[in-house]
């Protein structure tokens, strides 16, 4: 029992250290992007807290896999301390952790974030009192609460029975597996709600992460345009516009009023001239900035990072393609959510993670790197694309200039994407997420020359769906991911869409030219002349 407690403490201590690192990362990340002029304490705390909860939930995945793996020896036998009661206790500890964190996520998504968002939307109205702002925000938030309640009710009572197919032995495996996942109504309701959010996260990942995986490394490799060259172009544009303004004004030297067409052209030229002079001030500031010189010295390092990121992206894409192809060829079909038994087509990550798990916490570190990679590539995609509602651009994400409402939208999108990363990791390494490094014993017949006959020997085999129910423990993560087969089917098709969008994004990123060092300065209507430092960072 003491050994069991020691193993449990090791896993949770690593989780605790990672929790502190997550909180520090979220604080730095949110503070980096929030507007310095419109900073609000409540929106900042909400953004940090919601993003941290999502990352902490993802951090439970390697803990879950670690605990089920450490119940067994590599020879396929259970450890001495891993009796039935201890095993159930460990599983319940992780399950209650998921219950708590997923409940907090539902609270953030369906109540707290919408309330804070609508509160600041009403705050923009100068004549609205604080009481009116709260009432209006609660009124709009009530709609989200109703949606959450409906999802919980549907999840609690939706039928989980799979279609019958008596002619296939695979169906028997699927039925037994789903029976093993439990039938609690509370678990079903929570799983349905979280799966619905994960489905939205899948759409966000297809839109932002897939594009960011190609845009981020190629932008690092290509770099930005030369500041001196941009200043030269800008100076030529200023001279051209000034000359055009003088030409228009010369038409009224004799006192005659300008025609309406010329007045409109003059107004447009004056606006253009103000914008160009504003660009000139920012370009001059950036050219003389020590930060620009420092970044120039780091240019070779950025190229190396870009090459590394594109190689990692190709590794993920190849692994995801092989995993999806394996499901297409060998799964139990769409009505089972494309559940696959065993691995017929191995991919690099599916082979690497079980090997790293033998030296704890190497697999923990790799999963953390994968999650952070998805965060950074998603952020790159959001910064390049912006936040849109169909064809209407709602917000731009700018370093040091993101409004409180946009910051909440940003963290909401990242929260949903992080939720989806658990399924992405499962797609990349299904056997690892389901059973970790567990083995079980099977009887194998061998021929012995000494005894001139056959003998039976128990040999270890990697856990899969063919293993006896009492020999392999399924992770609690897998329960939440596959409680409803139709969500798994949607994720499967979403993975193909992810691959297509990545390829499209790769082509677009290759065709696009270098970015300006002050990209977005022309679009930012709130850009003041005394704050050029935001674009020098």
UniProtKB/Swiss-Prot annotation:
Could you give a single Gene Ontology term from the biological process aspect?
Answer: protein localization to lysosome
What keywords would UniProt list here?
Cell membrane, Cobalamin, Cobalt, Cytoplasmic vesicle, Developmental protein, Endocytosis, Endoplasmic reticulum, Gastrulation, Glycoprotein, Lysosome, Membrane, Phosphoprotein, Transmembrane, Transmembrane helix, Transport
PTM summary from the entry reads: N-glycosylated.
**Modification Phosphothreonine occurs at:** 235
Report the residue ranges where the short sequence motif WTKF motif is annotated in this entry. Answer: 291-294
GO CC field: clathrin-coated endocytic vesicle; clathrin-coated vesicle; endoplasmic reticulum membrane; lysosomal membrane; lysosome; plasma membrane
**Organism of provenance:** Mus musculus (Mouse)
Membrane-spanning residues: 8-28, 48-68, 98-118, 142-162, 186-206, 303-323, 362-382, 406-426, 484-504
Report membrane topology: Multi-pass membrane protein
Where are residues bearing Phosphoserine located in the sequence? Answer: 525, 528
The residue ranges for the Cytoplasmic side of the membrane come to 29-47, 119-141, 207-302, 383-405, 505-537
Q: Which GO terms describe its molecular function?
A: AP-2 adaptor complex binding; clathrin heavy chain binding; cobalamin binding; insulin receptor binding; protein transporter activity
Spell out the protein name for this chain. Answer: Lysosomal cobalamin transport escort protein LMBD1
Q: Where is this motif: YERL motif?
A: 229-232
Similarity comment = Belongs to the LIMR family. LMBRD1 subfamily.
Assembly, per entry: Interacts with ABCD4; this interaction induces the translocation of ABCD4 from the endoplasmic reticulum to the lysosome. Interacts with ABCD4 and MMACHC; this interaction ensures the transport of cobalamin from the lysosome to the cytoplasm. Interacts with INSR, adapter protein complex 2 and clathrin heavy chain.
Extracellular-side stretches of the chain, per the record, are 1-7, 69-97, 163-185, 324-361, 427-483
Localization annotation: Endoplasmic reticulum membrane; Lysosome membrane; Cell membrane; Cytoplasmic vesicle, Clathrin-coated vesicle
Q: Which InterPro entries match?
A: LMBD1_LysCbl_Transport, LMBR1-like_membr_prot
Q: What phenotype has been reported when the gene encoding this protein is knocked out?
A: Early embryonic lethality. Embryos show an impaired initiation of gastrulation.
